[in-house]
């Protein structure tokens, strides 16, 4: 990996990226309300399960294949699979989440003129755009390798989930860092599994997450938008 590639991926995975990731918990807050999360250990287990059982089978392999489509500039496949991913979101708030963050990142890519003009034109035609489609556009624009892209995305997801845990459980900073350290190996395993997953085996089935997210939409008191 080159220094340029590393810096670009650190930028994309940064919580300072202005796409609003901090405002979403992706079901974590609803799981807390349902008493599935009570402390640091159950928070770690919840995040680990989301990474291993959900992201590794769905979002991460989807990222790998969208990245390849951006490199090939297969506009029809990009739009078709982007629509499939949005349709696979289990609740209205999860759909709004990926659409809002995807739109924000696509706008940033356009404003910073990342990528060539032809691919930027394709990016502009995909609406609504899911976050993984916009993320892989940005990664392809910086010539990042698939394993590094998936690792950056997975780490950013784990970090955001941990941040939600710090605010909602609540947990201390050291407890949060212990969660991140504990999941390093799981990130590596999730990336390897995702890279070995063919397009027709991408699976976003997560019924518990869908039910919790739907409940969260009418939850009385909440900090997060999902």
From Swiss-Prot:
Source organism of this protein record: Burkholderia ambifaria (strain MC40-6)
Keywords: Chaperone, Cytoplasm, Nickel insertion
Quaternary structure, from the entry: UreD, UreF and UreG form a complex that acts as a GTP-hydrolysis-dependent molecular chaperone, activating the urease apoprotein by helping to assemble the nickel containing metallocenter of UreC. The UreE protein probably delivers the nickel.
Protein's UniProt name: Urease accessory protein UreF
GO cellular component assignments: cytoplasm
Function description: Required for maturation of urease via the functional incorporation of the urease nickel metallocenter.
GO molecular function, one term: nickel cation binding
Subcellular location field: Cytoplasm
Stated family: Belongs to the UreF family.
InterPro entries: UreF, UreF_sf
Residue spans crossing the bilayer: none
Major location (coarse): cytoplasm
């Amino acid at each position: 990996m080159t220094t340029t590639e590393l810096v670009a991926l650190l930028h994309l995975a940064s919580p300072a990226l202005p796409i609003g990731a901090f405002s979403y918990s992706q079901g974590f807050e609803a799981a807390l309300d349902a008493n599935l999360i009570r402390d640091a250990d159950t928070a770690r287990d919840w995040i680990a399960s989301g990474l291993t059982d959900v992201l590794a089978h769905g979002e991460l392999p989807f990222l790998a294949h969208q990245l390849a489509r951006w490199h090939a500039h297969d506009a029809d496949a990009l739009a078709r699979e982007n629509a499939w991913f949005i349709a696979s979101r289990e609740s209205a708030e999860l759909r709004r989440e990926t659409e809002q963050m995807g739109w924000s990142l696509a706008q940033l890519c356009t404003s910073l003129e990342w990528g060539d003009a032809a691919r930027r034109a394709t990016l502009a035609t995909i609406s609504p755009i899911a976050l993984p489609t916009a993320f892989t556009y940005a990664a392809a624009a910086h010539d990042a390798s698939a394993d590094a892209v998936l690792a950056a995305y997975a780490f950013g997801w784990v970090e955001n989930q941990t941040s939600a845990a710090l605010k909602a459980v609540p947990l201390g900073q050291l407890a949060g860092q212990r969660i991140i350290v504990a999941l390093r190996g799981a990130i590596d395993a999730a990336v390897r599994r995702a890279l070995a997953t063919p397009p027709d085996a991408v699976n976003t089935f997560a019924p518990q997450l869908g039910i919790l997210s739907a409940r969260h939409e009418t939850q009385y008191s909440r900090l997060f938008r999902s």
